[in-house]
Design a protein with these regions (language model features):
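Short, ordered loop/turn segments at secondary-structure junctions
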Residues: 12-15, 22, 33-35, 72-75, ...
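Alpha-helix C-terminal capping segments
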Residues: 2, 23, 135-143, 192-197
Length: 238
């Protein structure tokens, strides 16, 4: 079906990175939810994410779905600037090469993108997965940005799923702490996307089978919080 042919996947890799760093007895320090990344860590992060990327592509191949790897060692499309000095090699996407992406999509293949980028000196940087996905969605003006997580979207005070929410309602929920720290980076990625040409952005439970298909084909979605823009909104501060 056509629905598969225009998808772009940006993957993460936190648990695999943690396993590999543990093996080398490297303790990670986090600032604002981002891993402080020195030279030793960035080398491990890059190799783990590239291996994971190749695993995803080969499992899709086995399902007769043609996918193409994109990462810092092959067709890098993300140019970054350093996010903050104290974070080391953590990058903020500055520019996305749409041509490579659109070329892959035109061949009816799915781009599988690692959350890595290169700065102007070709130094590899680690990128927060949600930030990378949002930057790509904005750049190609996607119809939909879906951020997959292991929880059911955004929950209200009664812990019930909110299926549609506007940007102004989000700000209220952050003020009264209904939306907590862990969800804020995802919400920010969604807000940034819908402020910049993406029709709607959602946070979805990726551990539920077929959750993406439900979201694309059904009116009700499946454990999804969909964020529509009500007016331009500044990012939330943590």
């Amino acid at each position: 079906g056509d629905v598969y042919k225009r998808q772009i996947v940006v993957h993460g890799g936190g648990p695999r990175i943690k396993r590999e760093l543990d093996k080398s007895n490297i303790q990670s320090k986090f600032i604002r939810g981002l891993r402080v990344t020195d030279e030793k860590i960035i080398n491990i992060v890059e190799s783990v994410l590239i291996d994971f990327n190749n695993d995803i592509v080969s499992s899709l191949d086995k399902k007769n779905t043609e996918a193409v790897s994109i990462h810092t060692k092959k067709d890098n499309i993300i140019e970054v600037v350093p996010e903050a000095k104290e974070l080391g090699f953590v990058g903020l996407p500055n520019k996305i090469n749409n041509d490579i992406l659109l070329d892959i999509i035109r061949q009816n293949k799915i781009p599988i993108i690692s959350p890595l980028g290169l700065d102007k000196n070709n130094q590899t940087h680690n990128i927060n997965g949600d930030t990378a996905a949002m930057a790509v969605a904005k750049s190609v003006k996607s119809r939909r940005l879906l951020l997959m997580t292991n929880v059911d979207g955004v929950l209200n005070k009664e812990k019930k799923l909110i299926d549609e929410i506007s940007s102004s309602e989000i700000l209220e929920m952050v003020k009264d702490e209904t939306i907590t720290e862990g969800m804020i980076p995802k919400i920010n990625a969604c807000l940034d996307a819908v402020n910049n040409g993406v029709t709607a952005a959602g946070i979805i439970n990726g551990t539920k089978q077929h959750s993406c298909l439900w979201e694309i084909f059904s009116d009700k979605g499946s454990g999804l919080s969909l964020i529509h823009i009500s007016e331009p909104t500044r990012p939330l501060s943590i």
